[in-house]
A protein has these predicted regions:
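A structural signal for short loop-to-beta-strand junctions that line the ligand-binding cleft
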Residues: 104-105, 112-113, 141-173, 197, ...
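Hinge/lid segment of periplasmic solute-binding proteins
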Residues: 48, 119-170, 180, 185-189, ...
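Conserved N-terminal structural module of periplasmic/extracytoplasmic solute-binding proteins
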Residues: 17-124, 298, 321-322, 338, ...
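Periplasmic solute-binding protein
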Residues: 123-130, 147-183, 202-222, 305-313, ...
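Conserved C-terminal helix/tail region of periplasmic/extracytoplasmic solute-binding proteins
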Residues: 368-412
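Extracytoplasmic "Venus flytrap"/periplasmic binding protein-like
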Residues: 75-145, 154, 160, 176, ...
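Glycine-centered hinge/linker elements that transmit conformational signals in sensory
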Residues: 192, 223-253
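Extracytoplasmic/periplasmic substrate-recognition and gating elements
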Residues: 54, 77, 81, 245-248, ...
Length: 412
């Protein structure tokens, strides 16, 4: 059973304290994103001729032109001046490719010095020695970082990344079209049945929070899959199927990417998505944008997975100290304030002051029921066996039968 997060922030936060930038003797060129090559060579050694900057290769997966990419680019331009001892080579890799590309290149002895990504698979990557243990390297350097962020980058007492922000799925709505968001799953269904378009995001990641809301569990305390015990998971899948059929009948979108246009153009009154999209929504809707927790079910709050984004380091790299310096710069109080205000990131630092009601709304939503993402190997059983909901939504398999089949397959 995943552990529910009770209090994320006593981070309602102390005075904003931007970390002091190092003195820059001369301005350097801003790092530019490049297209991803088929493979990369092993990172270059830290030793560089006197007076020449050490090269640090950095990958990210922020979408082209997104608020996240724009904010990161501004930070990297500033870093080029504030950290003249480093030349930061930036590579943008599509999100769907970044993990596989990183693993393939690292296994071949190459890869970047570091990359930023959610802690989606930190546990498996750490167990496979694909990311570096930085416990000693980062010792004493995370002052001001909330323990939740550190925990999200930690496995078995070892630190594998520098935390940057918190992310989870929430309910975004247009106040000019929907003054009050649905507080319950019944209210959400009634809203959609009334013909008001909701860009509901379907998929096993987005579905996860609804199982608890209907009293279901995927795992017991021993990590055995127990989704077929009781009716909670089946009831949740049946409910999600009801919403899917409403969306299908009305020709509404069914994923967060396709839902961007109808929501930002004012056709959809709401969308379910993570706070990585806040910047894009805010740019389009301005003061009409609001956020709330996912609607609660008959058994209690929805419990979406709470992820931690962070910087991971390549065990092949001979530039880990340089990469760490860059990562610490990109996660200091000033940098996190910029990512918060411009890209909607929820900071992991306790010395960042929240002034945006949307960020505070996310904090409140996360506190309502978000669940810390576990880094256990057994989580793979969920992704492998519970992501094929099209068998219910499109092929018409009864929810109870589908849950039973998925559970049996997971426990083989």
């Amino acid at each position: 059973m995943l552990f529910s997060l009770l209090v994320i922030f006593s981070m309602a936060l102390s005075a904003c304290g931007g970390a002091a930038a190092t003195e820059a003797p001369a301005s350097t060129e801003a790092p530019a994103a490049t297209e991803a090559p088929a493979s990369t060579e092993a990172p270059a050694a830290t030793e560089a001729p006197v007076g020449e900057p050490v090269e640090v290769t950095f990958w990210h997966a922020y979408g082209t032109g997104s608020a996240e990419e724009v904010a990161l680019t501004s930070l990297l331009e500033k870093a080029a001046t504030d950290l003249p001892q480093y030349k930061i080579n930036v590579l943008q890799v599509p999100f769907n490719d970044i993990f596989n590309k990183y693993r393939t290149d690292v296994a071949a002895g190459g890869g970047p010095d570091m990359f930023i990504a959610p802690n989606d698979d930190l546990g498996n990557d750490a167990r496979a020695s694909l990311i570096a243990d930085i416990t000693d390297l980062a010792a004493g350097k995370l002052e001001g970082v909330n323990q939740l962020g550190i925990d999200g980058m930690t496995l078995d007492g070892k630190l594998y990344g520098i935390p940057e922000s918190l992310k989870a799925v929430a309910f975004w709505y247009n106040k000019s079209l929907l003054p009050t968001p649905p507080a319950t799953t019944d209210e959400l269904k009634a809203l959609m049945e009334s013909g008001q378009e909701v860009a509901f995001s379907f998929g096993c990641y987005h579905h996860y929070g609804f199982f608890d809301a209907f009293g279901g569990e995927i795992f017991d305390d021993n990590r055995t899959v127990v989704a077929d015990q009781g009716t909670g998971v089946t009831d949740a899948v049946s409910y999600l199927n009801d919403l899917y059929q409403i969306s299908k009948t009305n020709g509404w979108t069914k994923n967060d990417a396709d839902g961007l246009a109808p929501f930002t153009e004012g056709r959809a009154v709401a969308i379910t998505n993570g706070n990585w999209a806040l910047g894009d929504y805010k740019n389009a809707l301005g003061d009409d944008l609001a956020v709330a927790p996912l609607p609660a079910g008959p058994a209690g709050p929805a419990t979406p997975m709470l992820g931690v984004d962070g910087f991971y380091f390549n065990p092949n790299s001979t530039n880990q100290e340089a990469a760490l310096d860059v990562a610490l710069y990109l996660t200091n109080a000033e940098s996190q304030t910029i990512m918060m205000n411009e890209a909607g990131h929820v900071p992991v630092r306790t010395d960042v002051t929240i002034t945006d009601p949307l960020i505070q709304g996310l904090v409140d939503a996360f506190n309502t029921g978000a669940t810390i993402r576990p880094q256990v190997a057994e989580l793979g059983k969920y992704w492998t066996n519970f992501c094929g909901t099209d068998q219910v939504f499109e092929a018409g398999t009864p929810a109870e039968e589908w849950v039973k089949t998925a559970t049996e397959a997971a426990n083989k």
